[in-house]
Amino acid sequence: MAKDLRIVTVSLWEIIKIHSLTFVFGVWIMCKMSAKWVWDPKSFFTLQQRDTPPACLVDSSLGQHKYVKLKGVKFHYVECGSRDLPLVLLLHGFPDCWLSWRHQIPVLSQHFRVVALDLKGFGDSDKPSSRKTYRIDMILEELQQLIISLGVSSCTVVGHDIGGLLGWCLAHQFPELVDKLVAVSCPHPNVYRTSLHTSSNYRWLNFVQLPYFPEVDALREDVKIISKYHKHLPPHDTYLEAYKYAFCRKEDWTGPLNYFRNLLFIEVAENSRTIQVPVVLITGDRDKFIKLESIVKSTDYCEKFQVKIVDGARHFPHQERHQQFNEILLKSLVKKKSVEDGGLERSASKGIVNRMFGAVSSTVKYGNSVLDTVHKKTNGVVGSIPTINLLSYANIYDRTDS
């Protein structure tokens, strides 16, 4: 599918399984939609008209709003920081836009040139409706062209959710473009796909494979799905209204949903080389969409990695606990002298280590499999779970040595 077959299409059996589940869950969710419509049609079709963008979407205090046209597609992005500094490319998730990084742009721009992109189909970027225009090979080539158009040969990529999946794929397909990868609330694509059956939104992911109906469902009850995903924002919050403005039309949903309609059908080739550049995986300890086990398994695809847990955060740690998140991000991205002990940069916060251990040991459902993964990664160094040393455990989650 893509250059050198690093990103490939899943097996025929997987494709058949996805389409079969699409039919089953599609019928089920459409029946639920019909029941809600019959029960309360007025509420179901409520959609507030939003003609004027909230000030925060067009405010230039976070940076300059710019546009670039690549392969016939217009991309919108916000840029901040000196052009002489290393580039950090921020890729938002779903349902979101460049504004997702409002707490990170001011902090990062003190050390980096920051570009917060509206992905194709989102925000003020073009929104082609065709599903094929969101094929992963096309998306990656456009990101490659974007980085080149910014006048650099490589950059640090920070991606959340869908943006994280694209970051993983970009690091595999065009490793020369990525200096460092930060994946926020996002496991490796192969782990993401194989762990979907344990995800709380598994039915929805299969439902969105259908045409038209998922877009209609997203608009019901005044774009209720936005409030569902952004629970950390209070009702009538300025930023919540900004998101509702950005997703208040049917065509505002087709592009974003097309990512899911394509990403479920791809994987990184098993013979693909592990990612050589440093990878930082950041997740909230209360994320119901992403399991800690999937984050740990994702390190199998990395040569150098760090795993960081944001205490008290769900799926949007960079917004919900932005101060703690920014501290982790800066510590990971801004170069500092490593400790003398083998060049390994240990976590500065013992509290984070304890929370990580607590998250694993207290989660009975998948704790054993996580610890098994840890055991494999240490080649038997951690031999007995009851006597595991917290500092050794921290080192496993911060493998930054060569």
Where do the PLM segments sit?
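Active-site helix-initiating loop/hinge in glycosyltransferases
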Residues: 93, 320-321
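N-terminal cap/lid subdomain of alpha/beta-hydrolase-fold enzymes
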Residues: 106, 117-120
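Flexible "cap/lid" subdomain of the alpha/beta-hydrolase fold that forms the substrate-access gate
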Residues: 2-66, 72-88, 115, 122-158, ...
